[in-house]
Amino acid sequence: MAIFGLQIVISLIVFCFLTKLTKYYSFGRWLLCKGLYHYWPPTNEEFKQAIKQRYAKESNNKSKKQSNILKSYHKTSTINNNNDSSNTKEEFPIPIDTSIELKLIPVTHQDVIQVKYIDEFFSLVDFITGSIIIFILTELYLYIMPIIRQNNEHLNEINLSLFWCFISLLLALIILTKFVREYLKVDEGILCILFGALSFLLALCLQYIDEKFFDFNLKQTYGNHSIIYNDDNDEEINYIDRRFIYIVMLLSLINAYQTIILFFPAFRFGQLQYLFLLKNKNLNKKNFKNIFIFILIIINFILPIFTCLLWFKPIIQHININYLIKLKILSIIICILLRICLFKFYIQIYLDTAYDRVKILYEQQQLTTTRITNLSYQRNVTSIFFYLGVVTSQYILPVFIELIICFYLKIFSFKNSNLSINSLKPPKWLQNFDNYMTNTTNTNSSLILTWNDLHTFFNNQHITVLLSYVLFWHHTIFCLISCGSLIYNTYIQREQHITVKND
């Protein structure tokens, strides 16, 4: 209690409260199960009814052909009904001019609980939300208590929110790694490995030119130079400590891992951005709400690109270091909040792709001799909904990871390297409260000394440089891949349009 003080009480109370609250109100359920709609295909009976209505509209001179076709449908239907005992699914072709309407129904919790990875999404979003609340309360506590105690020094406490943020970060990385493992089972996994290897080489290049163009300060912090003169003592030769090379290799491996887990989330984000631009282009009615959302989504995509420029030395060379760190954290948090606020719009754009898939099916049927069956129709529509757990996790988890890295950067950037052991005496009533909570703070002062020794060996500057570099890579690689995805989808759509026009 002497190390964590009142923080552990706040943490336990908040988590107990949130555990009880999630039964009635969940931030994850609110994000996904309120205000969103998804398409659902007709049943087999509705398909048959639509086919009958289609043939009933034909002329009388084709009545014989109609009866033969209807008999064939009834025949296949009876055969498949007889085979239902052997667990075979009923399948029949659908004519191209059959009038079929997709059902647009709201997304409910009862529907999404059968979706894969949706339980992980709900539990992880709620846990990370609790960790964020604990971090904010802890920061308020550590800011207010020195004012109450009439002491400007830091408290004799270790920030407990670091522990909860670390657990949240670890769980998010586990889920994204699980997605990569699923991709590796198919051909798409090769892209993750390829871009991971390219990012490893790119990270090596960036870390060796950081002093000229980038504000990483890796060489200044970890690169101990040794000056050796040649035989004539007229020329100096600088050698960098070997430990710096090990750190460079370790950071490059971390960057490669970041790229691997962020490739498909960033690529999908760029794809959703393209779908939104395409939808807005074809939108006939444009009111104030649509224009406002369009501006927000454009800002959401462009603002992170300008945030990456805060690590370029030619731009920030005249800015104070403390203000620069605050500006980096503030700008990234604005990007994160904007992306969370636009969560429903992006997910709704994804759910609307079920309607586009049906249009593509009919276009393929017109160009080729393949025929649409009821199973292929249903499969193309329902696959969008059943992949919702992966899409939502890929959208929200990189945002939370970046937010947690910002929290760590804030804690280690604006904090003294040593924790004070002897501080000024607070007021009597507050001192009695402290004695009751901590049972005298001197009992565990040896642990605080150990914490201070660790800080002298590996101080806040070392940690801040690492966190700033990891944050830069996470933010920049996500922007680069999403921009590449937007360009790729635009090019593919243009090529398909040219091909259809030529045909």
Write out the residue ranges for each language-model feature.
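Alpha-helical transmembrane segments of secretory-pathway, organelle, and plasma-membrane proteins
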Residues: 1-44, 97-183, 187, 191-503
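Membrane-interface amphipathic/juxtamembrane segments adjacent to transmembrane helices
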Residues: 26-75
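Short, non-transmembrane cytosolic segments of multipass membrane proteins
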Residues: 68-88
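Charge-dense, helix-prone N-terminal extensions
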Residues: 88-98
